[in-house]
Amino acid sequence: MIESYLIDKMFNNAPFLDEMATDQGKIQPHWERVAKYYEQIGSERMRQFHEEVGRQLRENGVTYNVYGDPNGMNRPWILDPVPMIFSSEEWEGIEQGLVQRTELLNLVLKDLYGDQTLIKEGHIPFELIYNHGGFLRQAHHVKLDGDQQLIQYSADLARGPNGRMWVLHDRTDAPSGSGYTFENRAAMTRVFPELIRENHARKITSYYQTFKNTLSNLTINNKENPRVVLLSPGPTNETFFEHAYISSFMGFTLAFGEDLTVSDGYVWLKTIKGLEKVDVIIRRVDDVFCDPLEFKNDSHLGVVGLMEAVRQRKVLVINPLGCRVLENPGLMAFLPKISKHLLGEELKLPSVATWWCGQPSELKYVFEHMETLVIRNIYRGNQKKSVFGGNLSKTELEELKRVIRRNPFMYVGQEMVDFSTTPAWINNKLEARNAVVRTYVVADSENKCYKVMPGGMSRSSPDKGAFLISNQTGGISKDTWVLGKSKEVAASVVKAVKTQPLVRNVLPSRAGERLFWLGRYLERAAYSVRLMRMTLLSYNESDEDIHIHENPVLSTLLQTLTVMTGTLPGFSEKKNLKNPEKELLILVHDVKKVGSLAHCIQSFLTNAYAVRDRLSLDTWRILDSISEELTRMQKSDSTLMQAYQSLDNMVIKLMAFYGLNIDNMTRESTWHLLNIGRFIESAANNCLILKGMLSKSYDSESNKELMEDTLRCNESLVTYRYRYRSNLEMHGVLSLLILHEDNPRSVIFQ
């Protein structure tokens, strides 16, 4: 396995440096243990490990949303079982470079929203800043206490042809990926525990502890222990899993824009018990969407009046509003000179070579070398994709030049870097793929410095020679190991440096509503499954020679199913009663049919995703299995037999969700609202079934069969037999299902 990779590297991968192999086909020293381990286990065992890594991530509910793809919601996170590895000596240099760059960008941020001496003295062209959508004039002279304005920072790095690591992108607005990084490491630790121990891969938990301590040290509204919320765009955002994961993991309240309001100058969280004052907002919403009053007026993701509350120092927002201006790729062309001016130092981590088209000589260079450059808009918010000049025809190049000439200050040309390759497990073998490393830096308020996560999240391209690497374009994530010189003890995120008073975690009103509907859809789905199973069983056992109109039990079941699911006209029409199979299959698997089981399950899952931070890991494993079963149910070529099997599987999974949460949830608002929804739905469906099944009288045998089906649908048949020990009688059935106070399925119990 390793030998074939080395041979392929020597003969087929010549243009690129490789992370594991030298040009002479030798293994890099810091890769030797990993390479030896992979060679020992072989391809078949490696394939099994790959499957196990995927299973671990699926069970943990790790997902990613892909925009513009009908099937892109909650797509399983893909992790390569082959890590990216850095030696401790090389990482020390990278770490120093990242700290220096963060300090530099922090100074630039302070200046741009302060005295603007960098612009006044000509170190940064004013057109580059004032034309960038990330520069928010409303944030001028608005700052956090202390020197550290930039609390979190991420950088995408790649190794260039000269062997040095280059900075490709700066991420300062709402840097993402740290939660996925933690999950990647957790999955790799479970699958390769010995390999991680033998290589002394450094722990990454210290990053989260530093971040939490920095937040706890912020002083606002005269409170030593501030209330922190994580502001998320919502379940459709590409990294919503991470938002829910971090908020749950670190004990923050997950909030959407609709959960917050500004009143009396303060930001308040709308909870089921009233308004709670918010002190710190960790935002995962792009800054221009954070306040529709002062920024993007059509935004539904932010909070009206948030900027004024920040301006009045009634709330702190991290990272500060307006810091997206630092993501401007045009700044990379000026950072070397700015570093000398502000720090008196050369950049330790160079940026990818960048030419800003707002300068005549640079514009000329870009036009003359466009075939070898990547053309980017300076503002990501314009939704303009990077253009690779080498992929364009002469006509397209001329058209691009005309576009740039209209607004030259809005474009940069960047060198098309030949990224290094790294081993990736593709098609059950090791193949070389170009890779980018995302690193993370956090402010340490106690020591007045910045600290770098000793690791990160690497991404490799699924295709050979692909340089545009992102999760949206199918990039595969990789755990990133920094080899330590000795074993180290993992830092606890839960354990803070100093003892802090208990902060009650409140339930936002929006989350409370979602929990209520989660309970309702859970019970609605369970009743639908049970009634559909009985209907399908009755239909399969019915005599083909007897018309359904002449079969009172089956016709009653079908009509009751229509009423309970709210899918009129349904089986109230004679044509559907003549041939019920088509309508039955629609009611089972058509997610577009409002009232169908598939639609009900989809609504159940939607509400569950919205309160992801309130549900346990085991609960998410069950939810993932429900989602997988829903996917199987939606196959258009399914038969009644397959539908019946799906119903059997689904009811077990629904009851597993019910049992796990009813037993394990603390008896607080979350538990009560979930059960209120359940009780209301249970009572309503019980009444509908009783009315549909028992309101008409037929022959004695049919009546008994309908009473038995009614009891089965309410999971009360065994209870009836033990209680009455007699034949089925209407009085006993109604008494048990309506008036019995100890029967959890009776109407009065609800």
Residue ranges and their predicted role:
Residues 153-160, 168-171, 231-233, 255-257, ...:
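Generic beta-strand/beta-sheet core signal
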Residues 134-166, 280, 357-371, 390-473:
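Phosphate-binding site of ATP-dependent enzymes
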Residues 2-29, 151-153, 158-166, 170-343:
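ATP-binding N-terminal substructure of ATP-dependent carboxylate-amine bond-forming enzymes
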Residues 290-293, 424, 541:
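A generic structural signal for short coil/turn motifs at secondary-structure boundaries
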Residues 91-112, 131-137, 247, 263, ...:
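Active-site nucleotide/adenylate-binding loops and adjacent lid/helix of ATP-dependent enzymes
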Residues 26, 158, 162-165, 171-173, ...:
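Short, glycine-/Ser/Thr-/acidic-enriched flexible segments
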Residues 2-89:
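N-terminal low-complexity, Ser/Thr- and acidic-residue-enriched intrinsically disordered segments
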